[in-house]
Amino acid sequence: LNQVGLTALVTAALLSGTVHAADSDDLLKNAVDQQARLLMNEYDISGMAFGIIIDGKSHFYHYGLADKKAKIPVSENTIFELGSISKTFAATLASYSELNGTLKLEDTADKYIPYLKNSPIGNTKLINLATYSAGGLPLQVPDDVKNNKELLCYYKSWQPVFPVNSKRLYSNASIGLFGYISALSMNADYTQLMEDKILPSLNMPNTFINVPSDKMADYAFGYNAAGDAIRVNPGMLDAEAYGIKSTIKDMTHFMAANMGLVPLDKDIQQALDNNRKGYY
C-alpha cells in the first residue's frame, strides 16, 4: 500500500470502533493521542482524524497535516479518500435500488446489460458480484480498459477462474460492476445518483466522489514512499469501488446511522440495515 491508501484504510478502520465508556474527556483524549502517535510513527502517516461515539455523543480528534507543503493541519473539515470503504456506499445504493423495485440481487447481470448475454459474467447473479463469488474476477479492471465500450468488451470476454459461488476473491472489478449495474437499474449515472440522492439522504453534506472546487483546499494529500504528494488514480469503476471522499464528521455520522443512532428516512435506513445481512 502507498501512504494515501494506508492513511485512508487506517482512518476508516478506526472510525468503525465505538467507545462505550470513559472516565473523563481527558482520559479519552489521552487514549486517542497515544493511538494516534503510535500509528503515525509506525506507518509514517502525515495526518489523521478520529471519530468516537460515546452514549450518543460524537467526539473528534485531529492530528498532523493534511497538506505538508502548505502546512494545512487536519481538521473536522479535512476531506480524506476512503479507499475501499467506498464499497459500503455502493452496497447502500444497491440496497436502495432493490427497495425501490428497480433491481433484484438474484437477477443476472445480462438483465441490465443485454450486451453481456450468453457470456459467463452475463449469466452471473448480482449477489455473486456483490459478494466476490462471481468466479474469480481480478482485483482491478485492467489498465488498458479506458472507456465503457472497452469495459463491456472486457466483461463479455472474461472467463471464470473457478465455479461461481465456490470461492470468494476480493475484487474491485466485481463490486465495481455491481455498483455500475445498481445505478443503471435506476436509469442514472452512478456518480450523479450517489451525490444527488444517496449522500443527501444520509445527511452527509461533505462527502463526494468529485470534490468540488470550493472544497479542494480541504482535500488531504497522501504521500508515497518517496514523500511525493499523491491522490487516488482515476480508473474504470473507480467511483463504485474506491472513489468516495469524506470528512471525519460525516463518517462518524455514517457510523451512527449504521447503528440506528440518528433519524433517517425509512428507505435509506432500511438500505443500511439490509447491507448487514449475511450471504453464504
Protein language model regions, located:
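Bacterial N-terminal signal peptides
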Residues: 5-16
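Boundary at the C-terminal end of the N-terminal hydrophobic targeting segment
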Residues: 19-21
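Short, conserved catalytic-motif segment at the N-terminal edge
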Residues: 25-80, 102-107, 111, 147-159
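Short, surface-exposed loop or secondary-structure junction motifs
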Residues: 60-63, 67, 119-280
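Active/ligand-binding-proximal structured segments within catalytic/core domains
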Residues: 90
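Short, glycine/proline-biased beta-turn/loop segments that scaffold the active-site neighborhood
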Residues: 104-119, 201-202
